[in-house]
Swiss-Prot record:
Name recorded for this polypeptide: Olfactomedin-like protein 1
Leader peptide range in chain numbering: 1-28
Lineage: Eukaryota, Metazoa, Chordata, Craniata, Vertebrata
Disulfide bonds: C141-C324
GO cellular component: extracellular space
Swiss-Prot/TrEMBL GO biological process terms: signal transduction
Keyword Lyase: no
Subcellular location, record wording: Secreted
Residue runs in coiled coils: 73-135
PTM entry text: Highly N-glycosylated.
Domain Olfactomedin-like: 140-397
Residues linked to a glycan: N66, N138, N183
UniProt KW keywords: Coiled coil, Disulfide bond, Glycoprotein, Secreted, Signal
Main location: secreted
Length: 402
């Protein structure tokens, strides 16, 4: 009786059969068949073991890949947490300084103030406050705006909102472009010609900030970029453009940053400005329903020097700027032209609206997302629906202080 033995089992059986003695009786074929079956079972077990091993190897490779990905994410989160802790430490340190200062004021007030304070003392205090303001704003700058003479369209970009500027505190010719109302990329051009003509070499330098700005109220002053930190209501960042590091930060007091300050520029909650007196902030305030608040900031220490509640409303406003310590607010109807200055605020009281002619801007179809004055070249830098514009100004001397 012959039995067909396929594959490796047949080979093994034939190999063993070569060493067996000749068949002696009829039971030998049954024995061979039995051995063949046992080898088949063994072969199937080995194949199953191999399949299981391959599955384990594949699972281990997948596990290693997932573990590597998770370790990478863990490293990223670790860096983010470390940065957040460093920022928190800075804010805690600043808060501690402010608490110490408030404690000092409280102790001083407790020692000085009393219920028997006379009206004469109040008058004296008001006089001292007025003297402080006059000292703060007492510079050789004595000009007031009389007309917007002309405009020059410098460039066109795809972003309807943004800001562009020169350093208002140095003689540098560099031009900075900050496209969009929420971004962290600054483009630095060597000069105005390089900004206007893309073919001019070298090309712009790209600066990536560690934090994003909010709105279009950024300024460059004395080689520092000042901007409203996105995701916060009232935090101002001072960024060193040369070292590429965050130099300092501050919190504007009161209700700053709680609401947009211009009806026709809803992405801007804090508008920073620079004039001959230095750094300013225009923002909302607590209990000031729809009115702008003007705050003078010491650029070196980011300390608050003084704040004023202005009569200028945010309704129909689109932008504002300061010139020689005077706030000029630009308004338009429904975000369309004509664009005109209808509210002027001077903390010293020397410039009033009745002293000024009708201040109209050359006609533009849409509202401005930013208008900033540069005290170096005495011009306005503006952003209007993607167009970067320069406005030339006509000024005259202020009336003398009474």
């Amino acid at each position: 009786m012959m039995v067909a033995l396929p594959g490796a089992s047949a080979s093994l059986v034939l190999f063993l059969a070569a060493f067996l003695p000749p068949l002696q009786h009829a039971q030998d074929p049954a024995m061979v068949h039995y051995i063949y079956q046992r080898f088949q079972v063994l072969e199937q077990g080995l194949e199953k073991c191999a399949q299981t091993t391959r599955a384990y190897i594949q699972d281990f490779q997948e596990f290693s890949k997932n573990l590597s990905t998770m370790l990478g994410r863990c490293q990223t989160h670790t860096n983010e947490y470390r940065s957040a802790v460093d920022n928190l430490a800075l804010r805690v340190e600043r808060a501690q300084r402010e608490i110490d200062y408030l404690q000092y004021l409280r102790e001083s007030d407790f020692c000085v103030e009393s219920e028997e304070k006379t009206s004469a003392e109040k008058v004296l205090q008001e006089a001292e406050e007025e003297k402080k303001i006059r000292t703060l704003l007492n510079t050789s700058c004595d000009n007031m705006l009389m007309a917007i003479k002309s405009l020059k369209i410098v460039k066109k970009t795809v972003d309807p909102e943004g800001s562009w500027m020169k350093d208002a505190g140095s003689t540098s010719a560099k031009v900075y472009l900050l496209a969009g109302s929420r971004n962290n990329t600054v483009w630095e051009f060597a000069n105005l010609r390089a900004f206007m003509e893309d073919s001019v070499k070298p090309g712009p330098r790209k600066l990536t900030l560690p934090l994003s700005w909010q709105g279009s109220g950024q300024v460059v002053y004395q080689s520092f970029l000042f901007f409203h930190n996105q995701g916060t209501s009232n935090e101002i960042i001072k960024y060193n453009l040369q070292k590429k590091t965050v130099e300092d930060r501050m919190l504007l007091p009161g209700g700053a940053g709680r609401a947009p300050i211009y009806q026709h520029s809803l992405s801007t909650y804090i508008d920073l400005a620079v004039d001959e007196h230095g750094l300013w902030a225009i923002h909302s305030g607590p209990g000031i329903q729809g009115h702008l608040v003007l705050t003078k900031i010491e650029a070196g220490t980011l300390g608050i020097e003084h704040s004023w509640d202005t009569p200028c409303r945010s309704q129909d406003a689109e932008a504002s700027f300061l010139l020689c310590g005077v706030l000029y607010v630009v308004y338009s109807s429904g975000g369309q032209g004509p664009h005109r200055i209808t509210c002027v605020y001077d903390p010293l009281g020397t410039v009033r609206e009745e002293h000024l002619p009708n201040l109209f801007f050359p006609r533009r179809a849409r509202s401005h997302s930013m208008i900033h004055y540069n005290p170096r070249d005495k011009q306005l830098y503006a952003w209007n629906e993607g167009y970067q514009i320069i406005y030339k100004l006509q000024t005259k001397k202020k009336l003398p202080l009474e």
